[in-house]
Amino acid sequence: MAIVLEAKERADKKRSTLHRIRSQGGIPAILYGKKVENKMIFVSTAELEKALREGGRTSLLTLKVGGEEHSVLLRELQRDPLRGHLLHADFQAVDMSTEVDIDVEVRLVGEAPGVKDGGVLQQNLHELSIRVLPANIPPVIEVDISGLQVGDTVTVGDVKTDGKFEINHEPSEVIATILPPQQEEEIDSGEQQEAGQPDAAEGRETTPEE
């Protein structure tokens, strides 16, 4: 069952308007999609934080705005880099019968025998881009490493999809490997892939007051 968020429309994107919304416990946002008119909105910061805790960044949400309900995905979320406060959100309305591309967290599960023998676990991919129907988006993609010995790798081709989604990576791409102990100082921990960017650019909202 999708998490429900209440939203209200806002008239403009002036700095004073954005400041007022944030000071009153809201977060400015935009709603966009192929079959909906772009709308400047705001939602409760507390309710959005709760939705993120309960469903994660990739969960399907029901956004209520202007007497209408939209099935949406949270495509971009901006936070204050120093304080961590939410600043802006982009919601994309989706067609439940049309597949979407989305980045999903990779979570390694199990204990690798190679690590117990002194090997070093290196994770190369922290997210996977997948193509999936909105209702089938997994909260995380679990990858079992319980069979990995020193020198073993697990690749994209080893991921079990159960026929619910397609992975937009080459099967040979390495997700994780167990390095020999002497290579520990040479580990490249890997960088988390950037989430996809929505078409809407309004998220930066720095337009000065007119």
Curated annotation (Swiss-Prot):
Assembly behavior: Part of the 50S ribosomal subunit; part of the 5S rRNA/L5/L18/L25 subcomplex. Contacts the 5S rRNA. Binds to the 5S rRNA independently of L5 and L18.
SUPFAM superfamilies noted in UniProt: Ribosomal protein L25-like
Functional note: This is one of the proteins that binds to the 5S RNA in the ribosome where it forms part of the central protuberance.
Region (Disordered): 175-210
Entry protein name: Large ribosomal subunit protein bL25
Keyword Zinc-finger: no
Record's keyword terms, sorted: Ribonucleoprotein, Ribosomal protein, RNA-binding, rRNA-binding
GO cellular component: cytosolic large ribosomal subunit
InterPro entries: Rbsml_bL25/Gln-tRNA_synth_N, Ribosomal_bL25/Gln-tRNA_synth, Ribosomal_bL25_b-dom, Ribosomal_bL25_C, Ribosomal_bL25_long, Ribosomal_L25_dom, Ribosomal_uL5_bac-type
A single BP term in Gene Ontology: translation
Ranges of biased composition (kind: Basic and acidic residues): 201-210
UniProt-listed Pfam families: Ribosomal_L25p (PF01386), Ribosomal_TL5_C (PF14693)
Taxonomy of the source species: Bacteria, Bacillati, Bacillota, Bacilli, Bacillales
Family: Belongs to the bacterial ribosomal protein bL25 family. CTC subfamily.
Record GO terms (molecular function): 5S rRNA binding; structural constituent of ribosome
HAMAP family with a match to the protein in the record: Ribosomal_bL25_CTC (MF_01334)
